[in-house]
Amino acid sequence: MSTSPLAGQLLPADLLVDLPKLIDAYYTNKPDVGIAEQRVSFGTSGHRGSSFNTSFNENHVLAISQAICDYRKQAGITGPLYVGIDTHALSEPAQISAVEVLAANGIEIMLAKDGEYTPTPAISHAILTYNRNRTSGLADGIVITPSHNPPDNGGFKYNPPNGGPADSDITNWMQARANELLENNLRDVKRMDYHHAIKSATTHHHDYVHNYVKDLINVVDMEAIRGANVHMGADPLGGAGVNYWSAIADHYQVNLKVLNTAVDKTFSFMTADWDGKIRMDPSSAYTMQGMVERRNLFDVAFACDADHDRHGIVAPSCGLLPPNHYLAVAIEYLFQNRPQWRANTAIGKTVVSSAMIDKVARKIGRRLYEVPVGFKWFAPGLFDGSLGFGGEESAGGQRIKTASFPRFLPQKLKQKPAAILASAISCLPMNLAMQLKPV
């Protein structure tokens, strides 16, 4: 496929999404379940689509929300349901629709305090924190986001009690149930108007930002980062973490500058991806062009997608760091510097990830656990401790505690000089990973 002449460029106003028409289509377009593209379809991470082509509309969200309520009942999940949204234009109306159904079903829901946007890792963190040391009354969550996809997209993800993306057994059940509800014209969907739903005794508000930020110190050596005075830059790309980065900088007094705090639901500040479409994809050289141009302003800089479960790292020496290079370095470092991990703890990778990871695994004597594309395949292993690391080439490296960890690891590497830092930020050949030594 050829690269668009718009790639790497800011789009003219007439090519930006028409927000009023997008929202209107969300409410007025009704899916035809006889058309495959208009049915509920859970991919690698939830249901996604656009209201313009009737693949993400109010009826989809009502049906999925009721399907989640039905699943919780049959699975015996009775704890709170943590709900978060990103900055896509369709996320707010979708949350309204979901709350109307969840409240009508008597679900204890936890919305973000002050209407704050909520990254996927913050929802996962809330679920895991609540469920710690519990065997019953477990919590789960919903993240309303289409991830890095274009501004006219909407998305709806379910996270079970392990905090990660739902596995195929769960999503297949929900998909079938949601489509059954659509086929029956939503007759079995319980719903109350939003005015009453938001004031329901089962609707609560949760401070995701504070709880997430204060717990970072338990997985990241923030004191070492502060002591090294690494000059960091962070661009949330107008996504759900827009107010998290400054909170982290203030709380831990680290040398971190947030490059863009604007929330623009057209994402007009983003340079277009290879095909001329706007995507908040931090692993794309086209969408990260602005960050790369400013690479010499910082020791290391990073950006995230709209729901902050993907990241891209920019170094002065090479610009955008290839995700597989970083994953290999992160694995090398973590398994050499986490003595509390079990000797049989494995490394998770996807089938399309670099062979560099295989070489690192052999060098450090760790078993590889290879899965299809999609972070959901890592969640059970991370939850039970059989995996120490799960990462994929879309830049979604993550550990069980917090997904901010991969973004801060380069700072930890910088604080430890020698070979690991050089590998992480120099973009040298792939076989360099084999020369790494623990520091």
Where do the PLM segments sit?
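An N-terminal, well-structured beta->alpha segment
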Residues: S2-A104, T129, T135, I198, ...
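Short, well-structured alpha-helical segments in soluble
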Residues: V101, H125-S136, M288-R295
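Short, glycine/charge-rich beta-strand/loop segments that flank catalytic centers
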Residues: P80-H88, G115-A122, I144
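Short, high-confidence coil segments that cap the C-terminus of an alpha-helix
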Residues: I77-T78, R132, S136-L138, N296-D299, ...
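Short beta-strand segments
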Residues: G84, G141-S147, A303-D305, G390
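Flexible hinge/switch segments at interdomain interfaces of large molecular machines
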Residues: G34-T44, V189-D193, L259-K265
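Hydrophobic or amphipathic alpha-helical targeting/insertion segments
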Residues: A126-Y158, P165-D167
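Phosphate-binding chemistry for phosphorylated carbohydrates and sugar-nucleotides
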Residues: A13-L16, K21, A25-Y27, E108-S124, ...
